[in-house]
């Protein structure tokens, strides 16, 4: 089991939560990005730098993740591919993607993309709140506990 992070857009506060979890549980965390990242020295935390380009980091995460792995991403198409491979996906706001929710999220994403393409200003997401951080930590902990139970 491993944790993969779509790190280019992942908030630093979420990365910090993941770093602490990696040390505590000794589950490897890999941050995938197209830019250099600073991470604390650890046997359980590494970075993987990919080339610049559309979906290059996403494609690398899909290529390397395995069934049972967790991917941290706000990218809905990436989350859908991870679920199709048997992995789990969690966004930085603490929402765990599922087969039931991913279709709805993809439809909404496509709709918003159509609006933006037609010139409608849709705005971006709100900034990450304390509640979002707590929700993320709680969902991460649920996944970590499930992994621990599986490993005996």
Curated annotation (Swiss-Prot):
Signal peptide: none annotated. It comes from the Bacteria. It holds the Pfam family DUF188. PANTHER family: UPF0178 PROTEIN YAII. HAMAP family: UPF0178 (MF_00489). Belongs to the UPF0178 family. This is UPF0178 protein KPK_4355. It comes from Klebsiella pneumoniae (strain 342). The lineage of its organism: Bacteria, Pseudomonadati, Pseudomonadota, Gammaproteobacteria, Enterobacterales.
